[in-house]
Amino acid sequence: MTVCGAVVQRSGSRRCYVRQLMTPALQDLYAPQNKCFGCGPANPKGLRIKSFLNGDVFVTTFMPETHHEAWEGVVNGGIVGCLFDCHSNWAAAYHLMTRAGTNDLPPTVTADFHVKLRKPTPSKGPVIVKAKVVESTDDRATVEATIEVDGVITSTCRGTFVAVKPGHPAYHRW
């Protein structure tokens, strides 16, 4: 697997579908040792998504492999949920950091998220996840996100992500 801008691609089988939006990705810039299954750069068996900011929308492109499928040609719903959870959490954390006017990314956790699987997500091409913060306070952000393939939205998500304080089990875990 190689990273091409915001696109994870199989060796030689795909070209870049999305131009590089920000270098490096948020995960590489703020948490290079993170081992999270969905977004950890240091997890060789994880999804290793790369989140980029494009205007006020956060974008990641994921290239599914056969072991990410529920059945042939369709991404597993758990993988869809993981993409939403991790990518939306990064959108929330970065938003809260810029809202506070600092360069310190706050450790955030998922308070809740609701996924609507509108139709099967095809696994034979790039899966584009877009997330946007729609509400926020000093310590929490609500994010709405979509997954699309070939311009068709296959699922949506709305979640709340909260910055945690010292003493919380997730404080600076990534």
What spans do the regions from the language model cover?
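Conserved beta-strand residues within beta-sheet cores
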Residues: K45-R48, T61, T110-H114, I128-K130, ...
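A conserved, well-ordered hydrophobic junction motif at loop->secondary-structure transitions
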Residues: V59-C86, W90-A91
